[in-house]
């Protein structure tokens, strides 16, 4: 049932299809794929994030190409004009991520297994939220997706921080899907919001807490004073999928 020759232009659909035991359907993956590690050995890499090897994709004769967001619209348009079936997801929230997971599962005849795995994820998030509700206070959290210029948390990250018991310092920016619309032009805006915790995930670049702490005017930020600066690896938090 469903497509037999799938190309995954982003990492999360590759990871999900492997978890569902449907990796035999995958004929091409993103060059950024890290999970599962064996995917990089088993499958040809055909795309970055905003670029793809169109000729190589066409040569693989896919019956479905899976992509993510408006940033891959040009690639999708080119493939569609070549007669390729393309499905682009645009998940930005936790609910939309779970919906995407169900849709991909159903597409490959694994709706029941997808539902069971999604239910387990929901139960885990509910357990975390319940534990967080018992905390004495909700810390203010600044999540930095990039450092030059500073870019704050995308919506699903903001929501996950809330589930874990924190409050996003920039909740109004989290609603903006594009990174350019989450740029904080004046870094002193971050200082004024005085986060208790700073989490960095610099899109694959190593987070440098000492560099953040040394920024002009940041010495009085609570997170800096109390050394509450942490890194979450980008593949673990910035891929809108099962991770």
Question: What is the predicted role of each segment?
Answer:
Residues 1-243:
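N-terminal ligand-binding lobe of clamshell/alpha-beta domains
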């Amino acid at each position: 049932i469903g497509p037999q020759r799938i190309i995954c232009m982003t990492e999360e659909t590759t990871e999900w299809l492997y978890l569902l035991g449907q990796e035999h359907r995958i004929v091409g993956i993103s060059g950024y794929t890290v999970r599962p590690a064996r995917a990089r050995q088993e499958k040809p890499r055909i795309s970055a994030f905003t670029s793809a090897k169109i000729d190589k994709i066409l040569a693989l004769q896919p019956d479905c190409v899976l992509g993510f967001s408006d940033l891959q619209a040009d690639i999708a348009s080119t493939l569609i004009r070549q007669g390729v079936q393309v499905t682009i997801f645009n998940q930005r929230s936790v609910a939309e991520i779970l919906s995407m997971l169900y849709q991909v599962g159903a597409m490959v005849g694994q709706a029941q297994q997808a539902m069971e795995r999604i239910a387990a994820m929901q139960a885990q998030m509910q357990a975390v939220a319940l534990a967080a509700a018992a905390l004495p206070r909700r810390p203010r959290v600044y999540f930095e997706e990039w450092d030059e210029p500073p870019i704050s948390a995308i919506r699903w990250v903001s929501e996950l921080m809330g589930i874990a018991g924190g409050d996003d310092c920039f909740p109004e920016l989290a609603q903006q899907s594009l990174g350019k619309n989450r740029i904080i032009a004046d870094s002193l805006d971050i200082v004024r919001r005085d986060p208790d915790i700073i989490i960095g995930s610099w899109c694959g670049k190593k987070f440098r807490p000492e560099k953040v702490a040394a920024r002009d005017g940041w010495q009085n930020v609570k997170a800096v004073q109390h050394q509450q600066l942490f890194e979450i690896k980008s593949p673990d938090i910035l891929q809108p999928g099962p991770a």
